[in-house]
Amino acid sequence: MEEYGIGTCVYYRRKPFDMNFFDNFVARLFPKNVIRCKGLCWFKEEPDMCYLFEQAGKQMELKNAGQWYATMPKDELQQMLEREEGLRRDWDEKYGDRMQKLVFIGQKLDKKAIKEQLDMCLTDVEL
């Protein structure tokens, strides 16, 4: 439910972003009515690395958040999956724990447009 026209949009996908396409989205297409955005993303150029994207007002930052669990040695990963229910729940056979998960908060968000523009940043990659 939106109050005062402020709502949220959650973008969730498994495929990687192309870094150049995502950079173009952030630099040229990022909606002006987004107040805050935060979440995890990954790129075909660095498939083992998890990135944290944060935006507040005009400030935007993309920083390395370490490696995905999917990059762990198989025996360690198996133990981790047995212990961590959340990891097990979110696990994907192809992508492991890699995901695009961005939450946008803003006024009168065009959720469909945001998702379509971000979908244009996705690419196929063989892991």
Language-model regions: role of each:
Residues 1-127:
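P-loop NTP-binding site
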